């Protein structure tokens, strides 16, 4: 037996000697080693001996202790501030802390034992243990209380099996301990409290009609703020009589509006708010409290549910206008063109005033694609924040300034949990270039998604769980307790205005009718709808509460309802003859702009810049501060650019782009370029942001051109297409005088944002009268790089083109690129521009321009002549027009493939004509050019497969042109790759064989 008794002792000795080998201790040992290198006497003798034998380089030891250069300093944050670590459960440390405090109190005579005598050592130990157990219980409520809160108005939710996790007995308290005052050191706002006093505060705070999730937050200040804001004997949900009447009034308006429409337009789709009426007073509170804290503007985005109610009761849209739309009337004046949209997609704007604070509200128009409006709203808000600060701002605007504009997003529960763009937007929320000082998310959680139960629409307990990834606090609240909902909205607004971080309100409610008013929900949710039919409305429940409090009588409530109904009847009558007299899309920042004239084909604007100005900008583009250490390859890049500016020759793609950006910035147009790796450029061509090779400092030549210039921002975005493109589109809606560009890493990846192209960029102006000057740069070109690095799918964008809705271009020269970028800002209207941009042409010896082509009377050319026609030193001299046997029309990089092949073959009777802008199609210009070659064969050549590229789009247009010029050949022949399922081959040998084949077809 003796041997067996010694074994554990030996095992512990071995563990004591080897525990430092445990991987989790590596950081600690590295820090100890660094301390030893600084001062060997600062560590224990055993460690001193150990380190002395290692003999490592002292500098390496210190670097290892510091960790990699890219690590975030002071992270993760050490949790504190509540006597207990939120994460590590280090209760021994807490006990020591409390014991020391109690000893101090005992010494001062502030803490006494049961007999009124000073505390003995034993009593101090017992009191400290009581304190620790109490704090453990408090922490359990903070962590898990929300699971026990009364959140479901219908009472259908299953109660969680809590294993008595919140019971005092679980923490060692018995009823005999309930009268004893326990030291809790101002946790819950009390220094001493009995167990029942603690439970009263904890149950009211965490297990009532509000459930708060905040213990996942790692910032101690944010956690402490929430605790202090909601915990404590005086922190009940309490409203003045006036406040309660205001809530009741808004509820009556919300419910009465839905019921009125239900009677007047029986069965018509309205996606009513019935069951979620508490949203309306909550939104009022957000605007009111925000206004008190400095809020100037709210940009709203929401789905269809409750939209008409928000428009009328919160935004102040006249009811007569809504009733006019219900009877099929247009929402725009008769003289305004547009295809229109259904009434529950429309936007609006208004000013509301509370307590002398004026707040501007704007609701963003959106499609039925759920949640896709979120990034658009964030982008709009960011632009409005930038406009408040001004065009000459620094690139770091304080969040306290940004907080003056609030993006407020309303979500459905199934969509918030289901749509990936939600997570993308949360991912954007804290990033440089995309921060908006916190979005307020309000989930209308009616516990159903069309016909699908939550158990089948998400894998997590709450729809809001995705927001935990960015440590947003989440306020769950019962929608049948309007006071709790308004209180949650108030606290959420205060948190956002204080910390400039996103926050979520998850309002549990229900949908009184089907998904739309013509739908029967009992087919799929019989039990839920049985409960709903028997359930009183929110107005009834709240009215009964206020009657019980003696604040109102039933007659008062009936009178309020009758007055509201009478007002709506008056508005309904007015709606019969209502005529919209003002379309608001050219107000504010858009003043001075107009809608484009379809008939006006020559719309290039004045885009040329004097050579002197270009040279001044060019000089600044290649200058860096004296003490700035440029990478030697970048220095060569700058030297080459300096040479271009000096000679005025050889201007490449990236230089033309920088000159376009620089000239616009000098003229007062901010430039915002966003996308993956845009600072440097995917192909290492741009380099508009330079990095010091010794200290990583940044220098941006485009922001150092001259005093008073507008800002240039290049934003390396997160690895997302959908949210980032939606964000940039939103930005372009709010600031028409900024050139906003989004660049795909490769054009192939742009279809990750297809919804934004389809629902907003191509159709937003026709549906909602919202212009955008957004530029999309999509690298495109077949160079043997395989199916995912070749095609931006040009055909997709061309298929979307109609009614002068956007521009699609595939330009071939730096000069034309320069002019098309400047053209975006130099006309008095805005249109989106989809640009196929080059890859190999970025460094192609022929794809260069001169300063003369950017200045003087130069402008953008929708068609470009054959270089052999007007460049004297070309290897080929073309025949006269009458002798040309074939005209090969093309667009983009394939022109250079054709040109070089023609030169190699010595062909002089084939003319190459470039269509630089594919839409709006340059029909008149093409008639003028092709009239020269009436007898020639016409060929369309493209590098894309036949079922892709521009062929299907351009063929009918070209036939129309040929008919107009009475051409000998009335049909255009196709030359290009054959139709294919995949855009491009991944085999270089096959790529080259295909290229040779279609060049032969075009030129042979």
Swiss-Prot record:
Keyword terms of this UniProt record: Glycolysis, Oxidoreductase, Thiamine pyrophosphate
Enzyme Commission number, as recorded: 1.2.4.2
Listed SMART domains: Transket_pyr
Keyword Iron: no
EC class: oxidoreductase
BP terms from Gene Ontology: glycolytic process; tricarboxylic acid cycle
GO cellular component entries: cytosol; oxoglutarate dehydrogenase complex
Annotated GO MF terms: oxoglutarate dehydrogenase (succinyl-transferring) activity; thiamine pyrophosphate binding
Cofactor (UniProt): thiamine diphosphate
Source domain of life: Bacteria
Database matches in SUPFAM superfamilies: Thiamin diphosphate-binding fold (THDP-binding) (SSF52518)
InterPro entries the UniProt entry points to: 2-oxogl_dehyd_N, 2oxoglutarate_DH_E1, 2oxoglutarate_DH_E1_bac, DH_E1, KGD_C_sf, ODO-1/KGD_C, THDP-binding, Transketolase-like_Pyr-bd
Catalytic activity: N(6)-[(R)-lipoyl]-L-lysyl-[protein] + 2-oxoglutarate + H(+) = N(6)-[(R)-S(8)-succinyldihydrolipoyl]-L-lysyl-[protein] + CO2
Pfam families noted in UniProt: 2-oxogl_dehyd_N, E1_dh, OxoGdeHyase_C, Transket_pyr
Keyword Oxidoreductase applies: yes
Family affiliation: Belongs to the alpha-ketoglutarate dehydrogenase family.
Task of the protein: E1 component of the 2-oxoglutarate dehydrogenase (OGDH) complex which catalyzes the decarboxylation of 2-oxoglutarate, the first step in the conversion of 2-oxoglutarate to succinyl-CoA and CO(2).
PANTHER family assigned to the protein according to its UniProt record, in alphabetical order: 2-OXOADIPATE DEHYDROGENASE COMPLEX COMPONENT E1, 2-OXOGLUTARATE DEHYDROGENASE
Oligomeric and partner information: Homodimer. Part of the 2-oxoglutarate dehydrogenase (OGDH) complex composed of E1 (2-oxoglutarate dehydrogenase), E2 (dihydrolipoamide succinyltransferase) and E3 (dihydrolipoamide dehydrogenase); the complex contains multiple copies of the three enzymatic components (E1, E2 and E3).
Name of the protein in question: 2-oxoglutarate dehydrogenase E1 component
Lineage: Bacteria, Pseudomonadati, Pseudomonadota, Alphaproteobacteria, Hyphomicrobiales
Gene label: sucA
